[in-house]
A protein has these predicted regions:
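Conserved functional hotspots at enzyme active or ligand-binding sites that engage polyanionic ligands
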Residues: 1-107
């Protein structure tokens, strides 16, 4: 596992409100040096989310999808299904820009 890797997520039961439900992918956004911790920080994706400056569009398994950096979550690695490869460098840079915007981090 590494930062920028895309995994099929195993959805939890009982989502509420605006939490993402159903089958989807997640992008690992946690720094590689901390991947040995008991959880991993994931940004879920959605093909139905509305466009926004903080939702970079990436291609996963031949389909355009948006990375929902405003819905980051720490998940147990057992919730990660099959790997679907890595985001490209430009895609990962766009995710980083969105994280800076959503988290209010200065560059």
């Amino acid at each position: 596992m590494q930062r920028g890797e895309v995994f099929r997520l195993r959805a939890p039961r009982g989502t509420r409100g605006h939490e993402q439900a159903g089958q989807r992918y997640g992008v690992v956004v946690q720094v590689d040096e901390l991947l040995s911790l008991s959880t991993v920080i994931i940004a879920p994706t959605s093909t139905r989310a509305l466009p926004a400056s903080f939702r970079p569009e990436v291609e996963i398994a031949g389909e355009l999808t948006r990375v929902l950096v405003e819905q980051l979550g720490a998940v147990d690695p057992s919730r990660l299904g099959e790997s679907h490869g890595l985001l490209g460098l430009d895609e990962l840079r766009e995710v980083d820009r969105a994280l800076v915007a959503v988290l209010g981090l200065a560059r």
